[in-house]
């Protein structure tokens, strides 16, 4: 649970900004996106392999 403490006289916009910053730092949104778009491990490995081949070809062509 994310807790944002407010100081006396602090406005709501500043508190929301603090909350958003803490929310991003915890990585909750990334975890939710990752869980919603589940990718099978075999597909993940295949995509990583394809990306590695592409990156290697790209780096070799730059020489």
Swiss-Prot record:
The keyword Ribosomal protein applies. GO terms for biological process: translation. Keywords: Ribonucleoprotein, Ribosomal protein. The keyword Ribosomal protein applies. GO terms for cellular component: ribonucleoprotein complex; ribosome. GO terms for molecular function: structural constituent of ribosome. Signal peptide: none annotated. Pfam families: Ribosomal_S21 (PF01165). Belongs to the bacterial ribosomal protein bS21 family. NCBIfam families: S21p. This is Small ribosomal subunit protein bS21. It comes from Azobacteroides pseudotrichonymphae genomovar. CFP2. The lineage of its organism: Bacteria, Pseudomonadati, Bacteroidota, Bacteroidia, Bacteroidales.
């Amino acid at each position: 649970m994310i807790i944002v403490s407010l100081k006396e006289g602090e406005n709501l916009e500043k508190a929301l900004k603090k909350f958003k910053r803490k929310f991003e730092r915890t990585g909750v949104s990334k975890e939710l996106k990752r869980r919603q778009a589940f990718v099978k491990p075999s597909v993940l490995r295949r995509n990583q392999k394809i990306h590695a081949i592409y990156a290697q070809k790209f780096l070799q062509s730059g020489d």
